[in-house]
């Protein structure tokens, strides 16, 4: 509704008033404000996103410091996500081709600096999409075994259209009894090391791969809180195991925040570890999908 969005301005400033609810704001911005701004702006402004995973934002910013200092055109901005950092490169030019030409060498430099930590240079590509593309490109099947995340990893993977070609099944083995019955985790392992341990995570991953005859299996076990933590095993302690073609990797993580935040961080970390293990496991040939 044009009456809901009025541009107020003089020769120095223009202001646009918009409603707060995103469902109203976004279409009004796209349909009314953007064309209004385009008409006021000479040339064009283009952006490209470079998405990284598993790298702390502080490390990314340190690596980019020389590029960011004194920047004019293009500009570089970083955005922290759970387990990810997105870098937006923005440039202006007479036309889209000119702006793209300005962006291209910066993206090339980012690829040189961050290498395999970059999972995509497409804004629409999510981490789970990148993992699914890697699985599909190499004809790998995958399964998940989850405790503290309760199916969140499976849900992220199933977000990707066409993933039924590689995703076999997921198990939520929350109790020790379920870990033993379905995944073959040994009673002696649980008695000696506990459900939240590197040993248990490893046996969960191996057991899931064996049970579902999957090339890749990822398993998580942890303490999401707010209760259940001890001095030895505090809230936020998580172990993630990933088995790729029989090669097992288990990592220990310490997350903070609410129960929901810890579970979300664990889910992202599991996808990141899965991607890393697929990329580093011994292959005669690994096909890398276009990012």
Predicted regions and their residues:
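Structural signal for short hydrophobic segments within the conserved structured cores
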Residues: 16, 48, 249-253
């Amino acid at each position: 509704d044009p009456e809901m969005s009025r541009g107020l301005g003089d020769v120095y400033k223009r202001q646009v008033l918009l409603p707060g609810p995103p469902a109203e704001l976004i279409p009004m911005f796209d349909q009314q404000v953007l064309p209004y701004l385009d008409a006021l702006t000479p040339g064009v402004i283009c952006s490209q996103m470079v998405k990284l995973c598993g790298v702390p934002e502080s490390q990314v910013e340190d690596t980019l410091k020389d590029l960011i200092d004194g920047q004019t055109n293009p500009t570089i901005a970083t955005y922290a996500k759970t387990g990810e950092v997105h870098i937006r490169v923005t440039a202006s030019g007479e036309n889209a081709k000119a702006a793209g030409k300005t962006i291209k060498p910066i993206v090339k430099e980012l690829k040189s600096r961050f290498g395999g930590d970059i999972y995509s240079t497409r804004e629409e590509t999510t981490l789970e999409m990148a993992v699914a593309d890697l699985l599909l490109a190499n004809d790998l099947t995958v399964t998940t075994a989850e405790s503290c995340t309760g199916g969140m990893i499976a849900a992220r993977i199933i977000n990707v259209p066409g993933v039924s070609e590689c995703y076999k099944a997921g198990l939520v083995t929350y109790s020790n009894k379920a870990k033993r019955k379905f995944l073959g985790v040994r009673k002696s392992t649980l008695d000696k090391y506990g459900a939240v341990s590197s040993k248990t995570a490893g046996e969960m991953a191996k057991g899931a791969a064996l049970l579902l005859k999957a090339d890749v299996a990822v398993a998580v076990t942890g303490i999401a809180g707010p209760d259940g933590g001890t001095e030895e095993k505090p809230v936020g302690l998580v172990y993630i195991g990933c088995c790729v073609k029989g090669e097992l990797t288990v990592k220990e993580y310490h997350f903070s925040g609410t129960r929901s935040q810890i579970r979300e961080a664990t889910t992202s970390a599991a996808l990141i570890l899965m991607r890393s293990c697929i990329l580093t496991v011994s292959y005669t040939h690994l096909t890398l999908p276009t990012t």
